[in-house]
Amino acid sequence: MRAVGLGLGALLTLGGCSTLPGASDAPQLQLAPSLLPSLSYELVPYAPEPLAPADLWERLRRGYALPELHHPRITSELNWFVRHPDYLERTFTRAEPYLHFAVTEAERRGIPLELALLPVVESAFDPFAFSPARASGLWQFMPATGRLYGLQQDWWHDERRDVLKATEAAYTFLEDMHGFFEGDWLLALAAYNSGSGNVRKAQRRNQRRGKPLDFFSLDLTRETEAYVPKLLAIARLVRDPEAYELALHPLPNAPQFAVVETGGQLDLARAADLAEVDMETLYRLNPALNRWSTHPDGPHRLLLPVDKVEAFRTGLAALDASQRVAWVRHIIREGESLSVIAARYHSSVEALRRANQLRGNIIRAGDALLVPRASATEERYALSADQRERRT
């Protein structure tokens, strides 16, 4: 647009200031009034889009929006992390597959990017973290809160550990708390940890005593009083690691996984073979999966390393439907129940009912059942719920 404007300007200048011999005697160019509006234009300054940083840490810093506060509790947490650099190194190494998505989703919602670091506090970025209070996953959802935010939990999978759904649910929860506490992110974070009712109760106590209602003035549990300062301390360390003599290993500002449709239930050992990845990688990208296959009712998708997607799709397209999940024909014996048979084959009663179109639990000796079963040995499904429980 600028080039067109300058061309018109030059044309008009030449027409009015010509120095050619006899120019004053030459006929003057007249512009019809109806053409004048079409010649009006405006020069718009060119503002190039800022280049996206190659390093995810830098992208994260650019989106900081929480207040930068100085408080003894923050200093205490800072000092602990500085004394334990190995802890942060291990945690940020675990974060690498997940952090880019967490940052991208926070950016999409327009919320402070420091919130993408909350799993450092919640789970040390361990997707299988499980607390004594039964909180689970990167974002440590309790069972009831998870259900409230649409995270399904059953025998086949626990979406509190789902990388995509749990991240989205956590941000929605935080946004809800942010609105509830009238735009105060620190109170929203406190409520994420201890519940909005407990934070509101502490505010009412302070109100009766004529005290301030901000986070650092409230009398909360010891855990919650340390929770928010921990996040603020981690954010400060990420902002300026050199000031604390810490080295953050570079994280690429690029997706670390892709979402790939499976088109139906799929044995995880088969999926790992198709994608040419080890089972631990597959489970760590899909930690919601409790068993040896994806959920029969979906979602029919897997997260895979970006460089393995093409191999997986090619292999899946050539896979016969009968190879997706292995089946065995079981003859019911006297005294057997669906629960006994399900336990034997590491399946579920619901899966047996669905596969055999049973309305109830009544079965008869001598009849045959089709039973879905794993295609590999138990040991290969190293991070299934059964295998994890045996290690604890």
Residue spans for each PLM region:
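Solvent-exposed, acidic/flexible segments
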Residues: 81-99, 108-111, 131-139, 159-170, ...
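Short alpha-helical "recognition helix" segments of helix-turn-helix
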Residues: 271-274, 341
